[in-house]
């Protein structure tokens, strides 16, 4: 009976051995490279009194989960849902963006072993020192409002990228969703925004952008563009995803 039981348990035991081996290999890989999450929506939950220093079931990313998953860098974003493009609504969006960015900084400052970062050298140094890095981005150029000077203000705060739009057209460009093709791509203001982002060293993020906006920005930008959270349309036919040409 014992021998037969041992035989029955061998496949399960072997699976545990294989899992442990794969985990050890994954740890070696993660220890040798910098792992970076380019877009994290955790700040959307700040108003629900979440604590990033503790595991929270509401969050996909918090600091304990980063450590357990060997994630070195998380780019936490100030997300702005698209609203009206009136001066008043635009100013409110700008104020909300500054508020969220400041709160990210405050929460990181109170977390042991977690630091804000902006440049690649900082990310690699923090990894060597065993620290987690948090970068900050903005999801929706609606945050810029109608004032181009806000681009430089965001850059001085340490923002690394701005996603030009979200779901719905704004003053900068047309969106891949809920679009009336208001501009037919980038607006004149949008071109100024891209050029100012280039000047200030901010990455131009084209996630959520319409194809026309994508190619206009690609033509306008003097630096490489990014899509921080998009996938392949050939794999999943969704307006938000990128064609093979893109």
Task: Annotate each PLM feature.
Residues 1-181, 237-246:
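N-terminal hydrophobic targeting/anchoring segments and the immediately downstream early-domain regions
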Residues 27, 146-156, 178-226, 239-246:
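Histidine/acidic residue-rich metal-binding segments in metalloenzymes
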Residues 35-42, 209, 227-230:
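Histidine-centered catalytic micro-motifs
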Residues 80, 231-232:
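Acidic, glycine-rich active-site loops and adjacent beta-strand->loop/helix elements
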Residues 211-212, 232-234:
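Short, catalytically relevant binding-site loops at active-site mouths
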């Amino acid at each position: 009976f014992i021998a037969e039981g041992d035989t029955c348990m061998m496949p399960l035991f072997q699976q545990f051995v294989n899992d442990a081996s794969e985990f050890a290999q994954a740890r070696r890989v993660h220890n040798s490279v910098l792992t970076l999450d380019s877009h994290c929506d955790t700040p959307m939950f700040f108003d629900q009194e979440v604590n990033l220093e503790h595991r929270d079931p509401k969050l996909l990313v918090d600091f304990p989960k980063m450590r357990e998953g060997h994630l070195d860098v998380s780019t936490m974003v100030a997300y702005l849902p698209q609203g009206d493009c009136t001066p008043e609504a635009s100013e409110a969006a700008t104020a909300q963006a500054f508020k969220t960015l400041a709160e990210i900084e405050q929460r990181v400052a109170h977390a042991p072993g977690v630091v804000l970062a902006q440049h690649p050298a900082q990310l690699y140094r923090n990894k060597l020192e065993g620290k987690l890095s948090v970068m900050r981005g903005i999801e929706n150029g609606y945050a810029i409002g109608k004032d181009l000077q806000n681009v430089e203000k965001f850059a001085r705060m340490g923002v690394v990228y701005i996603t030009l739009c979200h779901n719905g057209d704004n003053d900068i460009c047309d969106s891949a969703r809920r679009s009336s093709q208001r501009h037919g791509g980038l607006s004149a203001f949008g071109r100024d925004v891209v050029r100012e982002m280039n000047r200030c060293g901010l990455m131009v993020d084209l996630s959520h952008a319409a194809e026309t906006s994508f190619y206009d920005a690609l033509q306008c930008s003097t630096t490489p563009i990014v899509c921080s959270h998009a996938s392949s349309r050939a794999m999943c036919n969704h307006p938000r995803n990128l064609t093979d040409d893109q």
